[in-house]
């Protein structure tokens, strides 16, 4: 039986169509995925992300442990509340999960990991934390609401008390602060400004209702997917998994190669991959009628005249742009155009960087 978040009843009251998402009953949409998408791009929308797993790590060797566990380097985190995006890799350099790590004090860090990978993540973290003497607390007592869009922070702030408003004033992206009952972070999965707010389960429903009254539109998984794809953000299980290198998933920027003597899980394999080359993630744009879909083959001819085939990892119709976009994993050497076969038609697509929309504006 699928689990329910503490906001399940609120979703049904808001008219949600509920679906099973990796063992959780979650809203797909509340009537119109397109309207929800546009609300986030132009005003403010919110998502129940309580299915995500929050893991608190404590102990004097926590930083040392995370420098070994993660491909990115938490040595970069020197200011309390600062967050870092990283892959957590296996020994062969595949991605076990992508996550966000927050630094609070030398002996207190927080991870936010994906719901679909919860059990294997917790097992992996626990296994490798043992020699470092880390105390691991899974925060199942917390719900999480993501409020996203150009007006999201202002609308959310109407629910904050004076101390909370002061705590977030001037807070830069990728920071988090505990202010009273709320953990407020300037993170998100849409390419827009906003907050991800963790709060006690018993307070989540009232907070959700207050956000609705403040003019924040409830949004489901459908809009969350089109928004993240427009922003060029990876979805675990599509752009990357345990068999895919971060170098082939546009995550090379999250690998901290320096200092060269830092040993992290997967480093040796990544260094070989870096030397020999890997596939890469690109963007595809198709302005003709039709929709680029997951797992369609992408064919192209390189400069030497050799033919190659890649694959679409995520594809959709972009509500913001009004045409189809996709992320695709291909070999190096792809040019400015490629061919995608949709049913029995060969469609020409433009090859771009793997990002399409930033702050509501087209970049592709």
Swiss-Prot record:
InterPro entries: GCS_T, GCS_T_bac, GCST_C, GCV_T_N, GcvT/YgfZ/DmdA, GcvT/YgfZ_C, TrmE/GcvT_dom1. One of its GO terms (molecular function) is aminomethyltransferase activity. It comes from the Bacteria. GO terms for cellular component: cytosol; glycine cleavage complex. It is an enzyme of class 2 (transferase). Keywords: Aminotransferase, Transferase. PANTHER family: AMINOMETHYLTRANSFERASE, AMINOMETHYLTRANSFERASE, MITOCHONDRIAL. The glycine cleavage system catalyzes the degradation of glycine. Belongs to the GcvT family. This is Aminomethyltransferase. It comes from Shigella sonnei (strain Ss046).
């Amino acid at each position: 039986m699928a689990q329910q978040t503490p906001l399940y009843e609120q979703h049904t009251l808001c008219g949600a169509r509920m679906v099973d998402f990796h063992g959780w009953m979650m809203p797909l949409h509340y009537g119109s995925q397109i309207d929800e998408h546009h609300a986030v791009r132009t005003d403010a929308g919110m998502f129940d992300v309580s299915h995500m797993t929050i893991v608190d790590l404590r102990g004097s060797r926590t930083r040392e442990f995370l420098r070994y566990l993660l491909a990115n380097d938490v040595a970069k985190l020197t200011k309390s509340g600062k967050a870092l995006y990283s892959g957590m890799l296996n020994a062969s350099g595949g991605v076990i999960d992508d996550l966000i790590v927050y630094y609070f004090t030398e002996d207190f860090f927080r991870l936010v990991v994906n719901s679909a990978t919860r059990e294997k993540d917790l097992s992996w973290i626990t296994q490798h934390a043992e020699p470092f003497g880390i105390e691991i607390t899974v925060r199942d007592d917390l719900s999480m609401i993501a409020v996203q869009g150009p007006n999201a922070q202002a609308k959310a702030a109407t629910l904050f008390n004076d101390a909370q408003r002061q705590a977030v004033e001037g807070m830069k992206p990728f920071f988090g602060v505990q202010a009273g009952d709320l953990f407020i972070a300037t993170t998100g999965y849409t390419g827009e400004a906003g907050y991800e707010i963790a709060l006690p389960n018993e307070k989540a429903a009232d907070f959700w209702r207050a956000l609705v009254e403040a003019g924040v539109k409830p949004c489901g998984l459908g809009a969350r997917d089109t928004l993240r794809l427009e922003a060029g953000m990876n979805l675990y299980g599509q752009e990357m998994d345990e068999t895919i290198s971060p170098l082939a998933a546009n995550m090379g920027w999250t690998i901290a190669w320096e200092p060269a003597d830092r040993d992290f899980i997967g480093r040796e394999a990544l260094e070989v991959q870096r030397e020999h080359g890997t596939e890469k993630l690109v963007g595809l744009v198709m302005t003709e009628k039709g929709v680029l879909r997951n797992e369609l083959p992408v064919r192209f001819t390189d400069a030497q005249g050799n033919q190659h085939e890649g694959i679409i990892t995520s594809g959709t119709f972009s509500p913001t742009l009004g045409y189809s976009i996709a992320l695709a994993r291909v070999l190096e050497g792809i040019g400015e155009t490629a061919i995608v076969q949709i049913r029995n038609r060969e469609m020409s697509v433009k090859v771009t960087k793997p990002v399409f929309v930033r702050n509501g504006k087209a970049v592709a």
